[in-house]
Structure formats: C-alpha cells, structure tokens
Amino acid sequence: MGYIESNLLPDEQIVYKANLHWKIFWKSSIVVLVGIFCLAIHAILAGAATGIGLALALRAFIDYKSSEFGVTTKRVIIKVGFIRRRTLELLLRQVEAISVDQSMLGRMLGFGSLTLTGTGGVHEVFHNISSPLEFRRRIHGQAT
C-alpha cells in the first residue's frame, strides 16, 4: 500500500494517479552505453562508465518507485523521495493555479513539470511527471 492509499480521509477515493516519466532513466542508459562502447578502447574506462551508469540507474529507479502523484475526490496528494521525503497534500478548494511546463520533446513523449500554487503561499514544482496535462485536467475536473 502506497503513501496515497494509506493517507486517505474517510469517504475519499483516488480519482487519478500519475508516475514519474521513464525519461529519468535516459542519463544512466547513455552512460552505460558509453561504458559498453569503451570496452573496445580500455577495460578500466568501460568498467568505470558502466558502474557510474548503473549507480545512476539505481537512483532513477528509487526515485521512480518512491514518487506518487494523486488526485482524490478531496485533495491533491504528492509524495517524492525515499530517504528525504517531500509531501504535498492540498485540498482541492485551496488550489489557486496549476501550470504545466513542457518542452517540444516533453510534448512528444508525454512528460513535463507541474507547478501547483495554493492559498497561503504554497508554491511547489514537480519535474518529469508523466502526462502532466491529464493530471491538471483531473484536478480541474474534481475542483468543479
């Protein structure tokens, strides 16, 4: 059971859940490929590049598995981080603005950054969210 499921209020249901986009694995994949390519040049260099790539992949995997983005019938609930956890639980009626930032590549592959602004000065930015426009649409759909 995830963070969102374990923190639901009475009579609250999950309407939509999103994840981090698989783009977070690009950097590690490129470094591992460089390591494999370097096998032809130098074994130590190849081992170092592959090791760094695998470490980056492990970090991306932990980030992917430990991040939750959800819209419920009453709130927006977001949790990121494993060791250093950051959470946002914002009542739908307190959401003032939602903005989505996507590059051209982000629009083509379906990822982007989401900025939530709430009453009381809450201003949070979350990067590399899969389908951020759908996430925003679901928040608007529940808020009305």
Residue ranges, per PLM feature:
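N-terminal basic, Ser/Thr-rich segments that initiate or prime the first beta/alpha elements at protein or domain
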Residues: 1-144
